Every structure is written in structure tokens, then in C-alpha cells.
Regions:
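Substrate-binding/active-site clefts of carbohydrate-active enzymes
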Residues: 3-18, 22-47, 53-165, 186-195, ...
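Structural preference for beta-strand elements that scaffold enzyme active sites
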Residues: 15-19, 48, 101-103, 170-172, ...
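Conserved, mostly hydrophobic/aromatic
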Residues: 20, 41, 51, 75, ...
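Short, solvent-exposed turn/loop segments enriched in Gly/Ser/Thr/Pro and often Arg
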Residues: 50-63, 105-114, 174-180, 203-207, ...
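Aromatic/acidic polysaccharide-binding cleft in carbohydrate-active enzymes
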Residues: 270-336
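Carbohydrate-binding surface patches
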Residues: 362-397
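C-terminal beta-strand-rich structural cap/linker in extracellular carbohydrate-active enzymes
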Residues: 413-427
Length: 427
């Protein structure tokens, strides 16, 4: 019997994923050019390297001069811009040799309009009321949607996944909410026979996206439904609250109440991706221009329950998000190097009791969050001055002296309260 409570690996909650766009990672923009950087990426504290789409990009209705990697032409070959299949497999071997797992992006909601499937299997595509191929999201002009009411499409896609699973350790599934959960479950079971323990990260979508789809009569799955097939899901269900709280439009407590609600409303094995940025969102260093605030949010991103995501460049406080449609190599000399902090946070993350109940309290007036894990045996507490200011807050600890796991410094709890400077405390 397929049972996600058994199937999923709880250690993923203590893992870190590094998202890498081959085109922008180096001036060369190739698979081979990534390899020399792998030891550094591993040393940051990376368990899993996620390669954004590696497949050929369509020419028709292409965005920009080079095209978007999420408008792919062929699910079973690699983008010649990046190199050959041999180059890709060499990179995957190098990732494994550096002690990391490798997952690749799969974009199964849509293809480019000139996909290799258009002529071979025209029946695989969604048709608009006028009978023409199209998509359900108006501004995605460089793609056409697939139709999962066609059984043959399921077989083709699962065969593709099983082919890549010979080499990679799992998949990040684009717009996973709009592809049937029943398909993902069947795909997971098939891949498990090829790659036992494969990792499944799903891009679950914003709630308003689900609502818009359903109002039009289209399929869209909730996060609760997707947890029947995925190990890790995106935090987009509460992303607008994160943006509101970090932008000053909402109190911190509004965001953290939603985070606490997740803890008690999702299946016990749930795992939410903990991230401050990704390729579709603003850079954290641009969102948090106050350095102490950036460091506090970064520490919380590692401390909170769920797999942590780093987007390449985040470790050097990059403020510019590389274009998806052009070659914009990351300037690795531009910002402050956070690598030593990230490594310390990674080491702490590995020790967190992530099976315990997780909860966050916020002091809105001071801009401080107190997060903790607690069960009958474990207690781990983090104090995060998210506004970058000192303050004094209540903590669920007995009075006494404790060591800050992040700095090694002694801190004192007195009358159930702890005074924090602008720096994070983890006990």
C-alpha cells in the first residue's frame, strides 16, 4: 500500500537545497563550467543540488533572445546551450562525488508551442474552446498546456521520469498543483522502482491561483492533496503574508499565525520549503536592506521546520535576480559573503528536533520572533530580531545561563525573559 507517512524521508526537514541556473551560474553558462564550483557549494552546507530545467528551449514565441527554460521543447534531451548529454552526466557524477544529491526540474504542466510532441502526439495538448492549442494562464505566452485527461500522456511522462531517474536523485516539479495528484502518485511509484528514495519537491501554487483555476472549471490541487505524492511543497500558500509582513503592510504575528496553522492542519509528515527567495521572487538582500534584519531572517529560514532553499547568489547577498530569458552571469564579487554564517546555521539545522511541534511567537512592537521546537524530550529555542533592533522577550526556558549555539557566547534568562541585541540567539 502506498503510504506517504512511510514513503517520505523525515531527514529532508533537516536538509538544504541549492537552486542553480546553469545559464547564469558562470560566464560560460555550461554544465562543465559548474563543476569547479561544486566543492564550494557543498561546503556551504548543501545536501541537494537542484538544477533548473536542463532541456532544450522552444523557438516559437520565445521570451527574450535566449528563451525561458520553463518553455521546453523535448523532455528527453538536454539543452545544447549547456553542453551534451555526456557533459550533463559528468556533472551529475561530480555532484555525487562531492557528497550531494542532484534533482532536476520537470515542467509537466506545459511545453513550448514547438514541442517535439506537437506533431507526434497532438492529442496530448489542451485545446481552447476554438479548438486551438493554448494555455490557461494568459501571460504565459511562450507555452501551451498539456491535457492529462489523455492516458497516453501519463505513460509518456512517466517513461521520461524513469529515464532521468537512472541518473538523478529526484525532481522539482513545476506548477505541480495543476497536474493531477493521481498522476504524481503513479509517477512516484514508477520512479521508486528505478530510484528508491527519490526526492519529490512540488511547486504548489498560491491560493488565489487555485481559486482562479477552479472558478474556470480547471483542475488545481491544494497542498493537502499534494502531500499524498510529494515530500516537500512550496510555501506559496502563505507567501503573500510573508511579503506583507516583511514589507510592513502586515504585522509579523499575522504571518507567523499562518505558519503555526500549517503545523496543525497539514499531515504529520508535511514538509514546507523554507525560503526567502527563489528564481521567481525578489532577492532577500534586496527585500531586507538592513543587514541585521537580513541575517535574522536568514537564520530563521534555517531554524524553522522544513527543507531550506538557497538560490545561487543568495550566499553573497546578491540583490539582482538573473533574467530567465537572457544570459546574466551572477557577479560573485558583488555582495557580502554569508558563507560562514550559512555553514554554522546548517550545522545547527542538522541537530534540530524536527519531529517535535514547531511554533513561532512574534512581538510585533519590537519586531522579534521567538521560535521553538518542543515535545516531551526536546526543546530548542531561537530568538530572531527580524527588525534588526535589540529588545527583551519572553522565552519558554527556565532561568539560568545558556550558550548561544550560533556564537558560543553565554546568554542569561531572567524572570523568563531574554535580552537580545541585533543578533540571533539559538539555544
Amino acid at each position: 500500500v502506498f503510504d506517504m507517512s512511510i514513503q517520505t524521508n523525515p531527514d529532508l526537514r533537516r536538509s538544504v537545497i541549492y537552486e542553480l541556473y546553469v545559464r547564469s551560474h558562470t560566464p560560460q553558462g555550461t554544465f562543465r563550467a559548474v563543476e569547479p564550483d561544486l566543492p564550494r557549494i557543498r561546503a556551504l552546507g548543501t545536501d541537494i543540488l537542484w538544477l533548473m530545467p536542463i532541456h532544450p528551449i522552444g523557438q516559437e514565441n520565445r521570451k527574450g533572445s535566449m528563451g525561458c527554460p520553463y518553455a521546453n521543447r523535448d523532455y528527453r534531451t538536454v539543452n545544447p546551450e549547456y553542453g551534451t548529454l555526456e557533459d550533463f552526466l559528468h556533472l551529475v557524477d561530480a555532484i555525487h562525488d562531492n557528497g550531494m544529491k542532484c534533482i532536476i526540474d520537470v515542467v509537466y504542466n506545459h511545453t513550448s508551442p514547438d514541442s517535439t510532441l506537437v506533431h507526434r502526439h497532438p492529442e496530448y495538448f489542451y485545446r481552447r474552446p476554438d479548438g486551438k492549442r493554448g494555455n490557461k494562464v494568459g501571460d504565459w505566452t511562450d507555452v501551451v498546456d498539456l491535457d492529462y485527461d489523455v492516458p497516453g500522456l501519463w505513460d509518456y511522462q512517466i517513461e521520461s521520469l524513469c529515464y532521468w531517474a537512472q541518473y538523478v536523485d529526484g525532481f522539482r516539479c513545476d506548477v505541480a498543483s495543476t497536474v493531477p495528484v493521481a498522476f504524481w502518485k503513479k509517477a512516484r511509484q514508477a520512479v521508486e522502482r528505478v530510484r528508491p528514495g527519490a526526492i519529490w519537491l512540488g511547486e504548489s501554487v498560491h491560493l488565489d491561483h487555485i481559486l482562479a483555476f477552479r472558478r474556470q472549471g480547471f483542475y488545481a490541487a491544494t497542498d493537502n492533496e499534494l502531500y499524498d505524492a510529494f515530500d516537500v511543497l512550496y510555501p506559496y500558500d502563505i507567501w503573500p503574508l510573508y511579503e506583507g509582513a516583511t514589507g510592513g503592510a502586515l504585522p509579523l504575528s499575522r504571518y507567523f499565525s499562518a505558519l503555526n496553522f500549517q503545523e496543525l492542519s497539514f499531515p504529520t509528515w508535511y514538509n514546507k520549503l523554507s525560503c526567502l527567495e527563489n528564481h521567481d521572487q525578489r532577492r532577500a538582500a534586496e527585500r531586507f536592506p538592513n543587514r541585521d534584519s537580513l541575517l535574522a531572517w536568514t537564520a530563521l529560514c534555517y531554524f524553522q521546520k522544513g527543507t531550506t532553499l538557497l538560490y545561487a547568489g543568495q550566499e553573497i547577498s546578491a540583490v539582482h535576480t538573473p533574467s530567465l530569458f537572457e544570459r546574466e552571469p551572477i557577479d560573485w564579487t558583488a555582495g557580502e559573503d554569508l558563507s560562514p554564517l550559512l555553514r554554522r546555521l546548517y550545522d545547527i539545522k542538522k541537530r534540530l528536533p524536527t519531529d517535535a511541534v514547531f511554533h513561532v511567537d512574534a512581538d510585533d512592537a519590537q519586531g522579534i520572533a521567538v521560535a521553538f521546537y518542543q515535545d516531551g524530550q526536546h526543546l530548542a529555542v531561537g530568538v530572531f530580531p527580524l527588525a534588526g533592533r535589540p529588545g527583551t522577550v519572553s522565552v519558554p526556558l527556565a532561568d539560568g545561563s545558556y550558550e548561544n549555539a550560533l556564537t558560543g557566547e553565554a546568554v542569561t534568562v531572567q524572570n523568563g525573559r531574554l535580552t537580545v541585541s541585533a543578533s540571533v540567539i539559538i539555544l
